[in-house]
């Protein structure tokens, strides 16, 4: 096995002080720092009062395939190569996968210096179930492809996390309403860890209306998983039984949701109203 090694360093999403001591040490001692944006990593090093000791090279999507051979050769010759993305953990919708795969194939040591990730940060503050989740990378840019992608996720039971451009967010949420249903709970996490961090929670219907006014910044979207059809129908039936006994719809939804972990009152309430619209039942609670 080569005496060199590959390090994957997680970088802060917005606050330099979120950098780990291990990342700081690696920036100072690595023989090569392969950065998604060389300007960004130099700015981070300056904020941390660190002098990057090794050679700095670019490693963004369009050049990664061209860099793999040279970086692997350096590692095989004993170099420590540190890979960093602009923000968060390399490889997760960022450069690094090709190099990691090549190093593993070559028997090279690969390790991660763990730290910030927009995926897990958004998930844990979304208020949505986090026991099981899936990450979908960036939403497709084109409308038809995006709608097809969302349609494939319509029956996904796990909470779903994905990235979206602020300029496409409104269109994406409108497509999500169409494909997933407007009652589905979700959260829009914007500018995570930064000065203007914002988390907007609500149904997809509500979030689509909110986003129509325009959104700025780095966006991570978290959407609740689908409830099983039979289970949802059963919950709606339980609510209607409470209503028939004289309990208000909202109170009935609270009672039923409290008895079923993972079910949110608002999600159930919206589902009851949608069911009533579809079956011709009373529109108002």
Swiss-Prot record:
Keywords per UniProt: Cytoplasm, Methyltransferase, rRNA processing, S-adenosyl-L-methionine, Transferase
E.C. number(s) listed in UniProt: 2.1.1.198
Compartments, as annotated in UniProt: Cytoplasm
SUPFAM superfamilies associated with the record: Tetrapyrrole methylase
A GO cellular component entry from the record: cytoplasm
GO molecular function: rRNA (cytosine-2'-O-)-methyltransferase activity
CDD domains according to UniProt: RsmI
Pfam families for this protein: TP_methylase
Taxonomic superkingdom: Bacteria
Enzyme class, spelled out: transferase
Catalytic activity: cytidine(1402) in 16S rRNA + S-adenosyl-L-methionine = 2'-O-methylcytidine(1402) in 16S rRNA + S-adenosyl-L-homocysteine + H(+)
Main localization of the protein described in the UniProt heading: cytoplasm
UniProt function note: Catalyzes the 2'-O-methylation of the ribose of cytidine 1402 (C1402) in 16S rRNA.
Family: Belongs to the methyltransferase superfamily. RsmI family.
Protein name, as recorded: Ribosomal RNA small subunit methyltransferase I
The organism of origin for this protein: Mycobacterium tuberculosis (strain CDC 1551 / Oshkosh)
Name of the encoding gene: rsmI
